[in-house]
Amino acid sequence: MGIRELITFRISGRGVWGYEFYDEARQKIGSVSSSVSPSLPVRIESQNIHWYSRFEMDTTIIPGIGRRVHDNQTGNEVFRLIYWRPGLYQVRSNSQPVQVEVKEGRYLFGQQGMPATALSERIPDIGWQPASSFEYEAYFKTTFYEKVNEVFALMVLSFPALRFY
């Protein structure tokens, strides 16, 4: 099997586009990332992408304020960012609940008191069709991790997953 193009589109938002490579046993075998801007078309090519993909963006924390991200070529809403508010959140169905609270004016979550960033809300019907041989998995995976020597956490939001068949 040769190299095949998975998807090409323009994204509204600035940040780092990243995607990870997995083998058939879902073992990670590599990853690539690059800076993106609203004017930059994002093109992903590989013969061994099993799960797809990840978008990373530093953001100012404004709890309760949402941001919508659109595919600039089609106008479809790709995902919506919803910033944390105090309360209990289930980030994924199999995850531990995350308590978000306010301390000294800052929104914090988790046992380490990490600053709260954002959670993603799946846009269920964006009218986007994956390339042939790929199946659209209608969910998002949200991951959080802390940047080294930085005040705020880095928000990591995945795009809709594609499973290779």
Give each language-model segment a name.
Residues 1-41, 47-48, 52, 76-77, ...:
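Low-complexity or membrane-interfacial segments used for flexible interactions
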Residues 40-71:
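Short, well-structured hydrophobic secondary-structure segments
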